[in-house]
Amino acid sequence: LIRIPFPKDAEKMKTTLVKVGMQSQVTQFEKTLNAAAEDASQFAKEIFIDAVKKMTIKDAMSILKGKDNAATNYLKEQTSNELYVKFKPVVKQSIAKVNLTKHWNMLANRYNALPLSQKVNPDLEDYITNQAINGLFVLIANEEKEIRNNPKARVSEILQKVFK
């Protein structure tokens, strides 16, 4: 499973908040961050299936003869924009459902109130959407590599025939 980390541009904020005794609030924020991404990922399957259905013979041959991540790269090229468009409203809803904005605003407001702190305010919807999509492609790339390199991972008859 992929874990979405605290936003990079807010890492200093995280460190500072933990130092001032807010570890449990930071942990809760990270849990809700990942819950929002998980909600969005359920829509990936239909988008990936559609991309595979639109695949040409040339695409299939390139994937078959390609590197360990050729299929992943194909899916990334064919689906990234559509995944973003589908995921972002779901992420927005999920953020509301799990009160992520409440957690983020509380953390950001307390951090921003500290003297000498560099103010933070990243776009959580965009961050979570992109991290969820990137996480999916990491999982797909790992699975693809395993299928290509390990005959036991080729669990379907079709995969066994393709990689003979």
Question: What label would you give each PLM region?
Answer:
Residues 37, 72, 76, 121, ...:
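Generic alpha-helical structural element
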Residues 1-32:
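N-terminal Sec/ER secretory leader and immediately downstream segment
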Residues 132-164:
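A cross-kingdom marker for long, charged
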Residues 1-5, 63, 158-161:
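Soluble periplasmic/extracytoplasmic beta-strand elements of cell-envelope proteins
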Residues 23-94:
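Mid-length scaffold segments of soluble, non-membrane domains
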Residues 82, 86, 90-131:
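An amphipathic alpha-helical core segment
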